[in-house]
Amino acid sequence: MANVSSSNGLEKRPKLRFPGFDEPWKATAFGDLVHEFSNRTKVEDEDVLLSAAIEGMFLNTELFGHQRGASNKGYKKIKYGTMVLSTQNLHLGNANVNQRFEHGMVSPAYKTYDISGCSIDLIAQWIKSDAAKRFFYNATTVGASVCRRNVEWDTLYGQSLFLPSLPEQEKIANLLTLLSNRIEKQRQLIIALKKYKRGVFEAVFSQKLRLVPTELQKPWKQYKLSDFATRVTRKNGNQTDIPLTISAQYGLIDQRDFFSKMVASTDMSGYYLLQKGEFAYNRSTSNEYPFGSIKRLELYPMGAVSTLYLCFAIKEEVVNSDLAKWYFESSQWYKGINNICAEGARNHGLLNVPTDGFFNTVHTLPSDPNEQLAVVDYLSNIQKKYEAAQRCLQAIENLRSGLLQQLFI
């Protein structure tokens, strides 16, 4: 049913309803549903330090990797069911109802509220909907810079939130909570699968796990990278307009899909032209990739990469390209990079890896084609299970997102 407003504008109906409910939703001032409180800590580390983000509530250590910075005496104490609103990023959707922690403390920069007169579970679901983002955004005005907006609190408290009867609130909350819990379980499954995948990859390429019968096992061979790879230096003319960048999850992807704006130069005629099946080494480091990352181009017939990348093609007569792909997903190649990269030889997060040294790094790999194929098949199956779990998560998130759009006004 389409949204329909009554003549006085105080009653509306959502697009999607549970059977048996037809009465209109009634307007309630937001300020009548929330009641601000400020219960402060009196000593250091009185409770666990929490942070509210657009994605939800987190332990401070989950977001920042450390526990203490400045003094946390005088921080705001919260409990399960507390609404936490960011005073700086509310217009971006940094609004949460804490349903993850029994108690904790947050920075005084947040506003904290008790919820009354409606289902806390319903508000916890609504607050992550597009309708809620619009609701909060409409109570902000342009700030001192283009990226800042000021919250007009009186405007926010006076805005109307349309709510159904309590039985319908509970129906909606139960459904969306069920989906939220399923999403969380799926995320935990993906985390576990990722950890398992990494462990198996390390076990295989360190030879702790062999995938052929003992009687058929042959010694692995040490190769220089140049023994099984050829450097690619062909330049892009006008063959492609796809600027490639490396994504940890998807490998080499179109930069325009990865960033909100172009990072590469609009003129890519001097870039390397990479063809499908070829590899690129990005020497930029991160927590997940302390020695940079090596990925194979799989999504496009060709693309252009910055000349800061080291590119190469695999000699298939020596090493299976799929084997090389999985090998570079392990950390077994890090040692070779570490040996040629001087301690502290980083320039703004870019490793100082010489080209000749890179192609002279040594790698231990199976020389038997049958064992190479066995490794490829085994690791490919693990990857397929991991990707299937990711697709399942995306499907559930899409379902929940669609319901959020249609169940709320």
Label each residue range with its predicted role:
Residues 13-41, 212-236:
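Non-catalytic DNA-recognition/assembly elements of restriction-modification systems
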Residues 62, 74-132, 145, 272-333, ...:
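A short beta-sheet element
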Residues 10-14, 88, 104-109, 143-167, ...:
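A short glycine-rich beta-alpha junction/loop motif
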Residues 168-171, 373-374:
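Short, solvent-exposed linear patches
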Residues 31-42, 46-80, 106, 226-236, ...:
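Sequence-specific dsDNA recognition surfaces
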